[in-house]
Amino acid sequence: MGKKVLIAYADDNMAYSLKRIGKQARNLGIFDDVVLWTPNDLPEYIQSSPLMKYKYGGGYWAWKPCVIHETLQRYEEGTVICYVDAGCTLDNGNEWILWTEIMKEYDTLLFKYRDEMPCWDKFGSVSTKIKHWTKKNSILFYDRMT
């Protein structure tokens, strides 16, 4: 297995979270590199996209495929790229060892969403059910994989 790289992105609205998750990633001592993307790091064709004018999703997440693709291009084959949302929290636990071992055999590691997330009501959602947060085609795609 090659290098292990963690990447995250945030605009000004989530700048504190980006800094926090970068610190958490470094403190884990697992990643060879921690790459924190901001709008200034994006290629011009993404920065100039009309979608980037919207606050929602930092520009309706138009940046996400670009951030992942650009990072993949910068590293050698066999590098493990771990994309995380800047708003999540990285726990310091033994799971990281397990996940690293799994990545030696599989190209992709996905995590199952739990329907009941007690603290989500503070975000104003009337429901934490995944159907309210995810496109139907995405749900159907991953249902076929299980």
Residue ranges and their predicted role:
Residues 1-146:
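Glycosyltransferase catalytic domains, chiefly GT-A lineage
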